[in-house]
Amino acid sequence: MLKKNDIVEVEIVDLTHEGAGVAKVDGLVFFVENALPSEKILMRVLKVNKKIGFGKVEEYLVQSPHRNQDLDLAYLRSGIADLGHLAYPEQLKFKTKQVKDSLYKIAGIADVEVAETLGMKNPVKYRNKAQVPVRRVNGILETGFFRKNSHDLMPLEDFFIQDPVIDEVVVALRDLLRRYDLKPYDEKEQAGLIRNLVVRRGHYSGQIMVILVTTRPKIFRVEQLIEQLIKQFPEIVSVMQNINDQNTNAIFGKEWRTLYGQDYITDQMLGNDYQIAGPAFYQVNTEMAENLYQTAIDFAALKSDDVVIDAYSGIGTIGLSVAKHVKEVYGVEVIAEAVENSKKNAQLNNISNAHYVCDTAENAMKNWLKEGIQPTVILVDPPRKGLTESFIKASSQTGADRIAYISCNVATMARDIKLYRELGYELKKVQPVDLFPQTHHVECVVLLQRRKG
């Protein structure tokens, strides 16, 4: 029986959905970070349970031809790029397999073609938003990323998958915080001022927003700090402060203040302009989000007399992208600020046939049914937990012909597809899209169509 610190030779036979290597020894399944299929390694046992164990690589005996040898291991240890050690074409194959496996294991579907995952030409430096913790490391204020499964900060300047201008802004901010002797947050002591730095940059506009997340309102000499920062980066149009005094892992608290400029940046998506506020959800990979949304629009095969429901509508990016091609759009979003953003964004783009309400998706769906609104197409883009059963049932009762489902969690997507099939819909098309290159995450668009007769 293997025990902690034993070293054993193993072959990696698979990857978990999170990108860890899988090895089988003495009837146990071991999970090993930074190990790829076909690799033979000496594995040190870290932990053993009744059926599973965890190990780490002591030595590579045979390495995979698909290993990316150039990756800085800091990106693996932090989880920034937990699939970065796998060559990009193989990452795309891995993601296609994740979708196929979920559809088969959860929904029992094996007879629908899953298209190859749509990837990026340049799969690095793509993130338009950074959320960076600020902590003291070896007596110095540092910015970086937490080690995987911990709150130990690893100082980093180049985040590999972020817009390089954002990385430059973070480093400049770090240096200014040091210069003005502003204290980093200390989780254990519940002390210090600066918790996190959040930076957004418009992919097309180049506009930059900086958010200082602090434990209390007063920031000593913040005006001088902002003045120095804007000298370096004149593209900054917004500096916000968010106050979070709670003992929590949540980035933002409830109180927001505008320290400089406006409280939003503007950027484009599929030809429309969008105002993006500090707390607003906006896809972090603009290039691939456009591919994702365009795929959903193409799948829906929209016509000028279509009535479209846009559930989980965010700031209106999907619904407003289709509004000019259809009769009406009805959007629902549970976050009030996002609904206000949607309405402003409709005005910004001279769109008058898009209507937004603040409610849960299932409540709004039921209310629209009562009001006699009969959608022909439903677009859904739910959070990771997927759709609720009540929403699926209510949306099925509308008689909508087509449902385009955008998913950020293929397991919950497969679960939801299973119920839709029971309620009279067929799965017609499946297209995975790589919004998060170098990570194990995969987005997917599927088309569900109502069965005839």
Model segments located where?
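Internal alpha/beta scaffold segment
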Residues: 153-195, 216-240
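Extended interfacial segments that mediate partner engagement and assembly in macromolecular machines
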Residues: 61-69, 73-184, 204
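Short, solvent-exposed loop/turn elements at beta->coil junctions and helix N-caps
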Residues: 115-122, 187, 196, 432-435
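Short, acidic/hydrophobic/Gly-rich beta-strand patch recurrent on exposed beta strands
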Residues: 21-26, 144-148, 211-213, 342
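Terminal RNA-binding accessory module
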Residues: 1-74, 107, 355
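Carbohydrate-binding surface patches
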Residues: 198-202, 208-218
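Rossmann-like S-adenosyl-L-methionine
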Residues: 2-9, 17, 217, 221-453
